[in-house]
């Protein structure tokens, strides 16, 4: 988790609270003063001061490594996060074997009720250029889901005494890619085969 607030009081409660050891201090980002409920002040002046810190903490190198984007922007980051959230919540909108409504969503997503911090992994994240000449099997995509490089939380460290588990849900609706976006569709060769 990354905690960001222009006003430090709320995040300082996490820094000094009971659960402070759960969060890395570098993931608690605060400014020196708040925007005083003024959008323009937060967007154009005070907020711009911590943008670099936030982008560094959100592992912007993810876009550099996987999508061949030299300098990822907010748009690139928002598209990636939007794609992940859309895919995770697809079973709320379409037919699927699990996560039929919001109450079942948490029940099925959290393997142990006391350990309720879900970790999202998304694979494959490849650019449109790579998709034309890379052939990925189901086994490779499945293995990529368990690689730490594809996890959306970079600072998590599991302890030995904590039980770990995962759940898989099947959704019959494939994810939709933003037209002109950074991520590639994987059905290009299928489309070529049936274009004749």
Swiss-Prot record:
The active site is at 104. This is Tubulin alpha-3 chain. It catalyses: GTP + H2O = GDP + phosphate + H(+). Its main location: cytoplasm. Dimer of alpha and beta chains. A typical microtubule is a hollow water-filled tube with an outer diameter of 25 nm and an inner diameter of 15 nM. Alpha-beta heterodimers associate head-to-tail to form protofilaments running lengthwise along the microtubule wall with the beta-tubulin subunit facing the microtubule plus end conferring a structural polarity. Microtubules usually have 13 protofilaments but different protofilament numbers can be found in some organisms and specialized cells. SUPFAM superfamilies: Tubulin C-terminal domain-like (SSF55307), Tubulin nucleotide-binding domain-like (SSF52490). It comes from Mesocricetus auratus. The modification 3'-nitrotyrosine is found at residue 19. InterPro entries: Tub_FtsZ_C, Tubulin, Tubulin/FtsZ-like_C, Tubulin/FtsZ_2-layer-sand-dom, Tubulin/FtsZ_GTPase_sf, Tubulin_FtsZ_GTPase. One of its GO terms (cellular component) is cytoplasm. Tubulin is the major constituent of microtubules, a cylinder consisting of laterally associated linear protofilaments composed of alpha- and beta-tubulin heterodimers. Microtubules grow by the addition of GTP-tubulin dimers to the microtubule end, where a stabilizing cap forms. Below the cap, tubulin dimers are in GDP-bound state, owing to GTPase activity of alpha-tubulin.
């Amino acid at each position: 988790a990354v905690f960001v607030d222009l006003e430090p009081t709320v995040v300082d409660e996490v820094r000094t609270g009971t659960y402070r050891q759960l969060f890395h201090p570098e993931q608690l980002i605060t400014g020196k003063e708040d925007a005083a409920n003024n959008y323009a002040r937060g967007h154009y002046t005070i907020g711009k001061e911590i943008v670099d810190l936030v982008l560094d903490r959100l592992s912007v190198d993810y876009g550099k490594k996987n999508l061949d984007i030299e300098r990822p922007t907010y748009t690139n980051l928002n598209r990636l996060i939007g794609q992940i959230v859309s895919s995770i919540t697809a079973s709320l909108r379409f037919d699927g074997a699990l996560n039929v409504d919001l109450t079942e969503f948490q029940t099925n997503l959290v393997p142990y009720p006391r350990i309720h911090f879900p970790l999202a992994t998304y694979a494959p994240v490849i650019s449109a250029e790579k998709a034309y000449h890379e052939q990925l099997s189901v086994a490779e995509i499945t293995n990529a889901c368990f690689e730490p490089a594809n996890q959306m939380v970079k600072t998590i460290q599991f302890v030995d005494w904590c039980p770990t588990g995962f759940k898989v849900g099947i959704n019959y609706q494939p994810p939709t890619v933003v037209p002109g976006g950074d991520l590639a569709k994987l059905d290009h060769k299928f489309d070529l085969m049936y274009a004749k």
